[in-house]
Amino acid sequence: MVDVDTGRFTVGVFQDVKWAQKGIDALRRAGLAPESISIIAKESAEVGALIEATLGAQGERIETSATGPLLARGPLVAALQGPARDLAKLGLSGTLRRVGFQAHDGRIFETLTARGGVLVSVHSEPRAADALAVLHSYGGGNAAIGAWTGRV
């Protein structure tokens, strides 16, 4: 059995850094705390600048076989790493189960990220529906809430 983080992560993938920035700005205007936001994307100077400007620190470099080198930061990254710190080995598709997503969701998020998408997540159970609405409204493709049991 897979251990699942009891907090809720709402995840969406934006087509590029420009769209991700718009979505993140909207999340912040909606009152979602910067420390609840995570960003995972293919390594680039543009992604590094987005992470640093949004989260106030540099992204961690993680290399997976499915995506190549990524830059990542935020509470989702810690949850995906797990106690074994095996995100690099298992990739997004193998670790998103830890935060309540099905394997096929993990493969979709991994594929979109490998194609240059910017994965943005929010860790906030009470505001999961709000985060989902913002992600959808600002172009966060395949936005979903991991193992969410509430109602929209």
Language-model-detected regions and their locations in the chain:
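Positively charged, small/polar-rich N-terminal and surface patches that mediate targeting and assembly
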Residues: 1-152
